[in-house]
Each structure stands twice: as C-alpha cells, then as structure tokens.
C-alpha cells in the first residue's frame, strides 16, 4: 500500500535535473511520473521550440492549462518547466495537492551540461542561463516547501529528497 498522499512537484532551473531525477524518484516510490513539457508537446502535437515560435505567452497559457489538469491526479512526481514560477497561479494550483521541491543545482554544473538547442529561452547563448537564474532563483526559493541541492549524482539527490520528505523506501 502506498503511503504517499500528495504529488511531489519538482521546480528549478532548466538543466537542474528535474526530469531525470523525477523519473528515478517516481520509480523508487512506485508512483506515476509526469514531465509537464512532454504533456504540453503531446497536447499540442508540437515540440517546445515549435510552441515557443507562437510566443512565450501561448506556451505559458498551455502550461497553466496542463498543470491544472495534471495536478488533480495524485500521487505522482511532476517535473515542471523552469518558468512555471513566472505565474503564481501555477504555484497555487500545484500546492493544492502537492509538496514543491526546488532542485537547486550549481550554475557551473548546469552551464557545463546543458544542451541549449532545444531550450528556446536560452538558445541565444549560455549567458541566458545566468539571466534566468537572476530572474527566478528567489522565486524558486520562496515558492518551494523544500530545497534540495543537486551537486552530486542524481541517485544521491533522489535519496536527499526521500530523506527530506520522510518517505520510507
């Protein structure tokens, strides 16, 4: 019997590990995993870069609609897009049935690993990562219930999440 009664929602910078950590976390808890970006792509039958060509506002509206629907099913692990914090209504929706975890990865590690070509907001160059961090870091901190430092392996980060959320494995 599963003891988890809420969604586990991962927020953080692009490239911080939300999707890969989320998949591993969901597997270890034997619950569903949802990557919001993949749900958006599926809903619109377009890639994220194609969606952004219609404008960031179009993407954000769709993101909010998908979050509203997805967050009603629980328990599951949800990996959000990095910009989910730009609209506080998204946070309110997610907090109704979930605990929000900020995956904080050091910027030097993100910059070293990130593939910018499929990330529309940073496709102009890696310096955009620093600008996004300045814009969003305080939002991630203030909207999260728990902050986890992802500075080692993904497996270690999953263990940190499990310990902080007091989930028995």
What function would you assign to each model-found segment?
Residues 27-38:
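Post-Walker A helix-loop "phosphate-sensing" segment adjacent to the P-loop in P-loop NTPases
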Residues 82-84, 106-108, 153:
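Short glycine-rich anion-binding loops that position phosphate/pyrophosphate groups of nucleotides
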